[in-house]
Amino acid sequence: MFRVAIVGIPNVGKSSLFNRIIGQRKAIVEDIPGVTRDRIVSTAEWRGVKFEVVDTGGYITGDEDKFAPYIRKQVEKELELSDLFIFVVDGKQGLTPLDKEIANILHRTEKPVIVAVNKIDDPEKEKLAYEFYELGFENIIPISAIQKLGLAELLDKVVEYIPEYEKEIQEEEEKEEKRDYIKVAIVGKPNAGKSSLINALLNEERVLVSEIPGTTRDTVDILYEKDGQKFLFLDTAGMRKKSKVDFGLEFFSVGRTIEAIEKADVVVLVIDANQGATEQDTKIAGLIQRRYKPAVIVINKIDTVDKKTLEKVEKQVRERLYFISYAPIVFTSAKTKEGLDELLEKIVYVYNQAWKRVGTGQLNRAIKQIQNLRQPPTYQGKPLKIYYATQLEGKPPAFLLFVNKAEGFKENYVKFLENNLRKLLGLENAPIKLIFRGKEEEKDK
């Protein structure tokens, strides 16, 4: 989501403006410099467009306040995270040297800045805003956070900067939020038993089933409800090896399988217990992994193999599909209906895990714990460092890690981080995405 940070020196009215924008009194407002010591993040909406808004502590240069270094650090983090800055200045007090210092910092970010000249509670005082053009920013807007003057113009300008694709994503997400079902893509090799599985769930011959590979040529969407939970099953035709795919119906079935994976909330990969995980299953699992999709692996047709064989198949599937180790395995038989209830339970479970939010404190404690187990390696002769991490909006769980050298974090250590984060954060069955953002090494302290 587009992120807007409110910055400025202490006691210029940042928290009052923040409270006006979000429509509730969330930040503490007092006439004491530096009252807001932590960043407060909330979601705001203007003219139907949503964005994140952050109230930062007042920027202080010296250390006369014991919290000054902490506040500076919080503000500096927002310089990286935010997409736009509302720079609040005091119209009554006028331009200060500290305002100029903050302006220089904001110019270096090369991100859009709107200067909100606060405490202009009378239209006749708007001329007091003119001197702030000296800061070198194009957008100077006189406002009064207390009296709500100029706020519409300010927020109109904020929304102008939000990219169209962000607005389109919000519209799609709003549509998604209104639906009350989980979209499930049933994928796998032809004749692995996908359609039979759905028919067994539905107790009816809803999907065409035969012994001929690839009988189901199209993607068939089926809405199903169990114990008050709705599922929309996207039954696909199955993916075949490229050598066997001719242009025409088979070619488009592969494309539709990929499309179903992209649309799905949860992907169910169906594997034939008689064959185990094949090369083609591995490729389908790769599609699931690259799209960070929550998944359940189904070993189907268990009525056709003995227990010892099934144990070997499970081991082989885990070894071959190691890169989606987060996906739980369910054993099913469409013929005897064994494992069907467990399959539905796992679909709901992994779906909920994909939506899980983790507190910033909990996340950073987990990362510290992981580093105590195994420190990041060195890169170009210097140790790699993880400074701070935060969870991004949306699903699946995605974490932004601020590090000294992003390019130094290679697959081996990244996998180590991922696996341990899953354990420590209760995300064992969720795909997680780690994004590394590098910054210059801090000066020797």
From Swiss-Prot:
Entry keyword set: GTP-binding, Nucleotide-binding, Repeat, Ribosome biogenesis
PROSITE patterns reported in the protein's UniProt record: G_ENGA (PS51712)
Domain KH-like: 356-440
Family: Belongs to the TRAFAC class TrmE-Era-EngA-EngB-Septin-like GTPase superfamily. EngA (Der) GTPase family.
Protein name: GTPase Der
Pfam families: KH_dom-like, MMR_HSR1
Gene3D superfamilies: 3.30.300.20, P-loop containing nucleotide triphosphate hydrolases
Function: GTPase that plays an essential role in the late steps of ribosome biogenesis.
PANTHER family, sorted: GTPASE DER
